[in-house]
Amino acid sequence: MTDKKAQPEKSICTCNDTAETLASVGDVIDKFLHRVLDVEECAKSFIDDARKNYNENADRLRLEASKCIDIIRNEEDSDQKLYGIRQLRRCEREIDRHNNSSPVTTLEKSLFISLFASFDSFIGDLISVLYQTKAELYKNISKEIPLSEVLTFSSIDELRQHMLCEEIESLRRKSYYDQFKDLENRFSITLTQFENWPSFIECSQRRNLYTHCDGIVSKQYLTICNKVGYAFQEEPKIGDELKIGGKYFFQACHIISVVAVMLGQTLWRKILPAKIEQADTHLSRVIFDFLHMEQWQRSISISKFVLGLPKISTDEMERIFHVNYAIALKAIGKSKAAINVLDRKDWSATSNDFKLAYAVLNEEYKKAKSIMEKIGGQGDLISEIAYHDWPLFRDFRYQQEFFDGYESVYGYKYCVKLSSIVEEKKAEVESTENDDAQ
């Protein structure tokens, strides 16, 4: 389920390499989440291709080498033998290059490092937007600056921006462990007491190994991982080489995404408590978007964080969070856990929209059909497009009760409207393609 988006005011962040308009902490989080999704898409698109090309090249070289050897052994013509020898030497050089190449590993390392480069940018954007939204925070910057340098600035605003950029760069030079501790002290809040904190720090330390040591385990890596309580399946030794692999890579993407959401939201709520409704709306949309992408574990992790928050803006929003959490749990086969989440709240006095959600998730499809008819064409939250689009109805859309209820409410079959929507979207795509071609 989702709610209407808030429309925050604009502010300018200029501490990164390029100036860019960022409306709120929500925009900062969204920008980072899209970068992580970009990295994941690159991994899915190019790593398999690199592995396939590597193996195909190996097969080609083996075949060429075999042909050259046959020519040398069997050909009586001296010119042909000489040609075979030259070709074999060329092939041997290609084989040597092939055997010393590692395109898959190179791509994995590059994309993994890119994750944390984006996180560095996220930290800068986050601090910048918070300071620019709440100007009193500038008073906490205690850096000294010579008068001669002060006089080079044309305005107080320019000076403040310079000081903020210096503060952000100083923070970025620290390890992530020290960055989080700095932010805890700066804003008087706990930021490291969450389940994936040790895993996040291990990932960040592994990034350092790939950046500086080609993945070779160092004493510092082991010391810091043990300091935060990271549980190794089998603790490596100094000098061992750490691999990445698909499972670890995508788990790192999951962890860093969730950490960014939690960090951004926690500071947003602490520093700008009056914006809690805006923060909740953003969180609801993030979870809703991950549900649409069928990123169930990401939805679950963020939902756990949300329902552990000390305050949620409205009862309606809290119920939306419960419903979306249950949707994700049900999608991974944890139907009983999903109902347990819903049963934390009393739904008897709620709107029909929420009663429909409960019935659907509890697979009470006859009851759900009846509630659909009570809601009619437009509910408090549910509209016609919701039946086509919302993850809540993902399984219900295959049930006869859904088809009957939909036709009863709207006067035409679900598949007729679905075909109409498909044609509209097709026309939109074609229109966009035509505009791009002009």
Predicted features and spans:
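Charged alpha-helical initiation segments
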Residues: 1-117, 121, 273-277
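Alpha-helical repeat scaffolds
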Residues: 297-306, 334-346, 366-377, 400-410
